[in-house]
């Protein structure tokens, strides 16, 4: 598998409340990918609430000079007591199926890492479905690793 090479530069912007409608369609695609379909009103409300409460950063990508959004990333900020520093969680990354392998996902990941570094974050963490091997390949090619001395556990509380 070769590296993604954008045909044109990817333009990435932070999304504010005024642009949530633009990213909602991509967010719906993301939810569908993870088999968690939602209606547009609920998806939009979720994104609006995260931004109103300053709980997340949403980045949106398009090819330079093109109006259509092709991908987005949503980051949540947390902290590491041991590192005594912020930690960024790259929680959501989605690229429209027709725009995959054009460098959009890679550009979004790199932007998240650059912004986290600028904000003094100790690290960026993320997770992906075990079956999503193309995402795993991207993350590993960008320096993300899975072998850590810390084991992560998950316990669902929603049922």
Task: Go through the PLM ranges and name each one.
Residues 83, 99:
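Glycine-rich phosphate-binding loop
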Residues 116-128:
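Conserved GNAT acetyl-CoA-binding A-motif
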Residues 24-49:
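Conserved GNAT-fold acetyl-CoA-binding loop/helix
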Residues 48-60, 89:
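A short helix-loop-beta-strand connector motif used in the catalytic cores of GNAT acetyltransferases and
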Residues 95, 101-114, 137, 141:
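Conserved acetyl-CoA-binding loop-helix of GNAT-fold acetyltransferases
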Residues 106, 130-149, 155:
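Conserved active-site alpha-helix within GNAT-family acetyltransferase domains
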């Amino acid at each position: 598998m070769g590296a993604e090479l954008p045909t044109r530069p990817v333009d990435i912007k932070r999304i504010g409340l005024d642009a949530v409608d633009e990213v909602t369609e991509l967010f719906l695609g993301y939810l569908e990918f993870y088999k968690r379909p939602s209606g547009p009103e609920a998806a939009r409300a979720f994104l609006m609430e995260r931004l109103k409460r300053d709980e997340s950063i949403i980045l949106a990508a398009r090819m330079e000079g093109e109006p259509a959004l092709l991908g987005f990333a949503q980051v949540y900020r947390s902290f590491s007591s041991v590192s005594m520093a912020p930690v960024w969680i790259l929680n959501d990354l989605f690229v429209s199926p027709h725009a995959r392998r054009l460098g959009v996902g890679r550009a979004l990941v790199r932007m998240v890492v650059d912004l986290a570094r600028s904000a003094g974050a100790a690290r960026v963490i993320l997770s992906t479905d075990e079956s999503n091997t193309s995402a795993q390949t991207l993350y590993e090619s960008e320096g993300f690793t899975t072998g850590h001395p810390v084991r992560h556990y998950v316990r669902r509380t929603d049922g």
